[in-house]
């Protein structure tokens, strides 16, 4: 048959139509009028489409071997137009096979221009949706060839056009992925053997340096949407003119098409590429950009899988250089916030893995085998930052879980002696806890300060390591500060006007009130011991940290912190404590600063005047380190009413305050009187702290303050889980705000006996002014005691002089409600009346089955 087709009249019609699209002149292009005839014939005769494709391929191969590029381009253009016109033809799969054979021949020519032509044709083919699938089509050759083109270099046959060849290879790989993922019968594109070629080819072009010779810069890559391919040839647009830009889009599209089961096949080549090309070396900007692109491209619910794969890779690289591990941890820190709440299912698993790596790094550093300790510390900081960013992406309740989990990993808090490695691990884990705590926003104290968590923090605040104690105070600052006041209180000075500090103050909630009533004893005793343990080498930081904690608790617990301040003053005066004069002066200054702050917050003029008087006396005495007015403008130093004779009564060479210098000390009675004048209950202000720690001798080293169980002076102490005793709720006068004072304690009062007669005050509340007058009335304990004695005497005289039956009859006549039977009858009547009123206007209640009267039948 082929022999009969040598002359034109003997050729079949489809061959004559194909031949007619070629021009007579070699330089002319495709004859579009004849191409339209060929297209119409192919659509009208779909059974001829396969033969048309075979003939076009035969002519293209012949022209390619004879080096006729114009005729080759005509054949390729004709094939592309037929593909687009006959996309719904039943013979399209057979025609597509001929088209792919033509593309393969062009790619095998090793001609840069022909490869460009083949790539464009293949991209056109990849955008066509076939109605019937092909069961035997394979793309192995195209993956190999396009991957090879992605690695083109100037030394190869491409010369200066190597960037064009790389772009063509990337477009070809994108076409292969698109064509494979849209065909359900070809899921093998996600096999590891194919991903090991596609992914490195994309990353190789993504890491290409810019024209200036600098390294990777993500700022040069524009943002793309999630669409994979346009209906037209999108490779001609300007934003894909360079391999770097095109490879970034290819990576995002590849990850966007990957299902959950295919993610591992894509992530593993990425990790391998980073290892081989040393892309983890700090700063890992390229690795961060790649994994951010991956996280943004995949489905949000699968983001945790990428985090888990990175952690698993960090497990496998535990023996690698510190720089590599630092890079992986930095990448984790950069992308974990993007994952958001999708990491919830593996929350504790991921956080436990990070903590395990942190402990392993600490053990390795302390083992003596670490050759680069600064790099190992950088690795630990990177892990801590990763855990902080990890916590920042979680909801608040999971942040609390993470803090509890971190606290549970802190070793040897209950032992008197711990190993050096454990102390260092405590330091690292407390820094981790501080990092997580900075991401948490406290709403209610009881929510975050659970019993176990608070007990652990109280123990951490008193450990041997001063850095751990300081970090624990910073944790308290972060969790107690709900109005961003800590930044203004961390280095609080002596302020003549506290409004200059710009604090935000509001009333305490009921929940926080109950929390502070329960735990104020433990917290104040911890603060007292923390001051005693303050390191002499870093004294100001520790004292300022305790002062900041006290200031943050000022609103929640006013009276108890005044009591603590007086105890701290007594501690500084105690000669048994082997403190330096500088430390004693720092404690005195801290007490003065706190009393000045709290006195102005509660707006108590007399208390403010007392504080200013003492501070002014100290400034005039000239004791080094006690003059708080040096850096204060408009100080009242020169106007102090203190006489010169009083100043000269003590020695001028003193370096600190002694108990004889009463004019330089704060007096508890004066403070109590000022508080009573403002309506505060200052009863517990005179209850001192017990400084004798189980009878231990104070040797001045500060160790007597560690690992001791405090003996609280409460009559209603209760044992806490950590060994502390909390003061009874009814015994603590805790002011929940500057405008509120709790009622007087009723404990150990005769009003609690069985003979008590509760007489509420008779309020003739005819006007609002009367109510205000009663509410603002000053509480006088002497007058209350006198009334209580009169009430007790009247009760005793009535018991002694009146018969029991007579007293019973008198009480029944005065108060009918004391008769139980009458009270019950009265309640039943009132309930019946309320029921009848409620049922007015309502439909009648349906009758019971046994109340229905059935009709009688006559037989």
UniProtKB/Swiss-Prot annotation:
<dbReference type="Pfam" id="PF21052">
    <property type="entry name" value="EFR3_ARM"/>
</dbReference>
<feature type="compositionally biased region" description="Polar residues">
    <location>
        <begin position="696"/>
        <end position="714"/>
    </location>
</feature>
<protein>
    <recommendedName>
        <fullName>Protein EFR3 homolog</fullName>
    </recommendedName>
</protein>
<comment type="similarity">
    <text>Belongs to the EFR3 family.</text>
</comment>
<feature type="region of interest" description="Disordered">
    <location>
        <begin position="696"/>
        <end position="728"/>
    </location>
</feature>
<dbReference type="InterPro" id="IPR049152">
    <property type="entry name" value="EFR3-like_ARM"/>
</dbReference>
<dbReference type="GO" id="GO:0005886">
    <property type="term" value="C:plasma membrane"/>
</dbReference>
<dbReference type="GO" id="GO:0072659">
    <property type="term" value="P:protein localization to plasma membrane"/>
</dbReference>
<dbReference type="InterPro" id="IPR051851">
    <property type="entry name" value="EFR3_Homologs"/>
</dbReference>
<dbReference type="InterPro" id="IPR016024">
    <property type="entry name" value="ARM-type_fold"/>
</dbReference>
């Amino acid at each position: 048959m082929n022999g009969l087709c040598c002359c034109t009249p003997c050729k079949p019609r489809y061959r004559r139509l194909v031949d007619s699209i070629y021009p007579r002149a070699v330089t002319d292009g495709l004859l579009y009028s004849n191409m339209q005839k060929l297209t119409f014939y192919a659509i009208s005769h779909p059974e001829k489409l396969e033969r048309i494709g075979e003939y076009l391929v035969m002519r293209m191969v012949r022209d390619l071997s004879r080096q006729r590029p114009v005729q080759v381009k005509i054949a390729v253009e004709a094939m592309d137009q037929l593909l687009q016109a006959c996309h719904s033809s039943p013979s399209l799969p057979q025609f597509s096979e001929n088209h792919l054979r033509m593309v393969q021949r062009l790619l095998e020519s090793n001609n840069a221009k022909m490869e460009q032509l083949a790539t464009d044709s293949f991209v056109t083919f990849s955008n066509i949706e076939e109605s019937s699938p092909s069961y035997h089509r394979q793309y192995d050759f195209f993956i190999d060839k396009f991957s090879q083109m992605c690695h083109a270099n100037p030394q190869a046959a491409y010369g200066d056009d190597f960037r064009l060849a790389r772009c063509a290879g990337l477009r070809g790989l994108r076409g292969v992925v698109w064509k494979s993922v849209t065909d359900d019968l070809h899921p093998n594109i996600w096999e590891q053997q194919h991903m090991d070629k596609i992914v490195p080819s994309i990353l190789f072009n993504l890491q290409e340096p810019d024209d200036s010779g600098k390294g990777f810069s993500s700022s040069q890559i524009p943002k793309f949407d999630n669409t994979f391919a346009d209906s037209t040839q999108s490779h001609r647009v300007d934003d894909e003119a360079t391999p770097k830009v095109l490879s970034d889009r290819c990576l995002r599209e590849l990850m966007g098409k990957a299902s959950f089961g295919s993610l591992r096949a894509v992530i593993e080549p990425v990790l391998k590429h980073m290892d081989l090309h040393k892309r983890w070396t700090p700063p890992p900007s390229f690795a961060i950009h790649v994994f951010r692109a991956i996280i943004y491209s995949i489905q949000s619910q699968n983001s945790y899988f990428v985090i888990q794969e990175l952690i698993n890779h960090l497990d496998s690289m535990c023996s690698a250089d510190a720089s590599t591990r630092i890079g992986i941890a930095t990448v984790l820190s950069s992308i974990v916030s993007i994952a958001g709440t999708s990491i919830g299912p593996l929350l504790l698993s991921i956080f436990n893995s990070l903590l395990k790596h942190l402990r392993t790094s600490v053990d390795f550093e302390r083992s003596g085998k670490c050759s680069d300790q600064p790099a190992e510390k950088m690795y630990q900081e990177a892990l801590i930052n990763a855990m902080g960013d990890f916590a920042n992406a979680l909801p608040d309740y999971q942040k609390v879980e993470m803090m509890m989990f971190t606290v549970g990993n802190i070793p040897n808090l209950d032992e008197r002696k711990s190993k050096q490695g454990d102390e260092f691990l405590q330091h690292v884990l407390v820094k981790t806890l501080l990092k997580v705590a900075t991401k948490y926003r406290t709403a209610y104290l009881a929510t975050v300060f659970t019993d176990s968590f608070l007990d652990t923090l109280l123990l951490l605040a008193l450990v041997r390591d001063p850095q751990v104690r300081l970090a624990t105070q910073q944790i308290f600052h972060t969790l107690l500060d709900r109005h961003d006041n800590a930044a203004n209180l961390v280095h609080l000075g002596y302020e003549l006007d506290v409004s200059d500090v710009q604090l935000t103050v509001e009333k305490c909630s009921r929940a926080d009130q109950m929390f502070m009533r329960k735990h104020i004893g433990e917290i104040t005793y911890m603060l007292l011991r923390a001051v005693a343990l303050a390191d002499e080498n870093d004294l100001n930081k520790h004292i300022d940290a305790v002062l900041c904690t006290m200031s943050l608790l000022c609103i929640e617990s006013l009276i108890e912190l005044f009591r603590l301040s007086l105890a701290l003053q007594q501690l500084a005066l105690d000669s048994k404590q082997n403190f330096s004069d500088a430390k004693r002066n720092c404690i005195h200054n801290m007490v003065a600063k706190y009393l000045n702050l709290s006195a102005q917050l509660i707006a108590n003029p007399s208390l403010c005047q007392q504080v200013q008087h003492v501070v002014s006396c100290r400034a005039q005495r000239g004791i080094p380190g006690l003059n708080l007015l040096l850096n204060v403008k408009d100080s009242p130093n020169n106007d102090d009413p203190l006489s010169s004779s009083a100043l000269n009564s003590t020695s001028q060479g003193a370096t600190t305050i002694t108990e004889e210098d009463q004019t330089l000390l704060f007096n508890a009675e004066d403070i109590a009187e000022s508080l009573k004048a403002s309506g505060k209950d200052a009863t517990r202000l005179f209850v001192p702290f017990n400084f004798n720690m189980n009878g231990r001798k104070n040797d001045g080293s500060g160790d007597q303050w560690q690992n001791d169980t405090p003996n609280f002076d409460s009559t209603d102490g209760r044992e806490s889980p950590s060994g502390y005793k909390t003061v009874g709720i009814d015994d603590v006068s805790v002011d929940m705000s500057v405008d509120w004072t709790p009622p007087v304690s009723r404990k150990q009062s005769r009003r609690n006996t069985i003979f008590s007669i509760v007489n509420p005050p008779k309020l003739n509340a005819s006007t609002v002014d009367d109510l205000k007058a009663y509410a603002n009335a000053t509480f006088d304990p002497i007058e209350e005691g006198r009334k209580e004695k009169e009430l007790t005497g009247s009760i005793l005289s009535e018991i002694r002089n009146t018969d029991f039956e007579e007293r019973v009859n008198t009480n029944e006549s005065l108060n009918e409600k004391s008769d139980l039977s009458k009270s019950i009858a009265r309640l039943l009547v009132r309930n019946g009346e309320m029921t009848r009123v409620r049922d007015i206007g309502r439909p009648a209640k349906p009758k019971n089955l046994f109340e229905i009267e059935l009709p009688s039948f006559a037989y």
